[in-house]
A protein has these predicted regions:
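Residue-level detector of flexible, active-site-proximal loop/helix-junction positions
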Residues: 99, 233, 379
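A conserved regulatory-domain signal marking ACT and ACT-like small-molecule sensing domains
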Residues: 57, 237-408
């Protein structure tokens, strides 16, 4: 008998019929003797609908009250799924995040989990219940409802698995695992049987929508055995995400080609080249709670430098506004921006021991006439910023160049 945490996303529970199908799947697992904790998202589109209602009332909704509103989406799903499980003859009990004491900090709309009180869940499991928990939400020390941000249900599932020392955390989505790249761009893309936490973390940070990045961080930190599966397939092993030493003896050089369209570039031109200037630019950006990704500095011969960095496209206007205020203070000439960029990355733990990956990547892009605007590297990743019009071509040619359509 195993203790398994299963998480079902909004698409998986998007209709009452799909909720019934999920209940049938859960019933099969319980009949095999497993103890089950189920984490669910709101039904497809429900969170956006609730945010829309809030914005109809208040253009910039109060974060505390917005959390109260959007947390109701998961509450509907847990109740419906518990009823569906009862119809399958199972004992089921549903809980909101606050009810099971998923304790978070007080950062509304982007809270982080601090602690989970698992006693109530363990008692229900011992009594033979399937425990259904609302993802995406918790409660702070003062008793305020909090939410974890987009994709937070993945984090809830992994955090519960860590707290309960579950044998496995299964993330059910509308895809059957992690692929070498998006099959919609490269039909020959392969499903990976396994991938390391490091690789999955890079791919999640680079825009892969299979798993939310914080959930991968959590799983890696607490060594939670994580598996991605499709809720629309009866069979299939999905993709196992594991620590590197548990993976196959010889790693492939590259495991996947990831990409992100949600990128924009900002450049501060004519910046005085003096110590501390990077902090003077990026400090106010950080104070505005904006995330910076890639950074490049071009030093000129006239005592000035051009300072460029990338942000999420959705935060471009806010970041540009901050820079316009900074410009006069630091004596820069101009702020320019470009929303028409993308990021493409080659990811793989195997590149640690195989030189020449970067040169192969750059040569492949050059042969297609694709100009590289920015470059960033880590031990297991090489990322380039390109004109967005080249995204799909770049992904296809790199996938082919690294022979990812063939199993190693």
């Amino acid at each position: 008998m195993a203790l398994i945490v299963q998480k079902y996303g909004g698409t998986s529970v998007g209709t009452t019929e799909r909720i019934k199908n999920v209940a049938k799947r859960i019933a099969r697992f319980q009949k095999e003797g497993h103890q089950l904790v189920i984490v669910v998202s709101a039904m497809t589109g429900e969170t956006n609908r609730l945010i829309g209602l809030a914005k109809d009332i208040q253009a910039s909704p109060d974060p505390r009250e917005l959390d109260v509103v959007v947390s109701t989406g998961e509450q509907v799903t847990i109740g419906l799924l518990s009823m569906a499980l009862m119809e399958q003859g199972l004992k089921a009990r549903s809980y909101t995040g606050p009810q099971v004491r998923i304790l978070t900090d007080n950062t509304h709309t982007k809270a982080r989990i601090l602690k989970i009180d698992e006693d109530r869940i363990r008692q229900d499991l011992d009594e033979g219940h399937v425990v259904v928990v609302a993802g995406f939400q918790g409660v702070d020390e003062a008793g305020n409802i909090t939410t974890l941000g987009r994709g937070g249900s993945d984090t809830t599932g992994v955090a519960l698995a860590a707290a309960l020392h579950a044998d496995e955390c299964q993330i059910y989505t509308d895809v059957d695992g992690v692929y070498t790249t998006d099959p919609r761009i490269v039909p020959e893309a392969r499903k990976l049987d396994r991938i390391t936490f490091e690789e999955m973390l890079e791919m999640a940070s680079l825009g892969s929508k299979v798993l939310q990045i914080r959930s991968v961080e959590f799983a890696g930190k607490y060594k939670v055995k994580l598996r991605v599966l499709s809720s629309f397939q009866e069979d299939g092993e999905g993709t196992l995400i594991t620590v590197e030493e548990d993976s196959s003896m010889e790693q492939p050089i590259i495991s996947g080609i990831a990409f992100n369209r949600d990128e924009a570039k900002l450049t501060v031109l004519g910046v005085p080249d003096r110590p501390g200037i990077a902090y003077q630019i990026l400090g106010p950006i950080a104070d505005a709670n904006l995330d910076v990704d890639m950074i490049i500095q071009n030093v000129g011969h006239d005592g000035t430098t051009d300072f460029s960095f990338t942000v999420n496209r959705s935060e471009f206007d806010k970041a540009r506004g901050v820079l316009e205020e900074v410009k006069a203070h630091i004596g820069a000439r101009e702020v320019v921006g470009d929303k028409g960029i993308c990021k493409v990355s080659a990811v793989g733990v195997g590149m640690r021991s195989h030189p020449g990956v970067a040169s192969k990547m750059f040569r492949t892009l050059a042969e297609e006439g694709i100009n590289i605007q920015m470059i960033s590297t880590s031990e297991i990743k090489i990322s380039v910023v390109l004109d967005e019009k080249y995204l799909e071509l770049a992904v296809r040619v790199l996938h082919k160049a690294f022979e990812l359509d063939h199993a190693n």
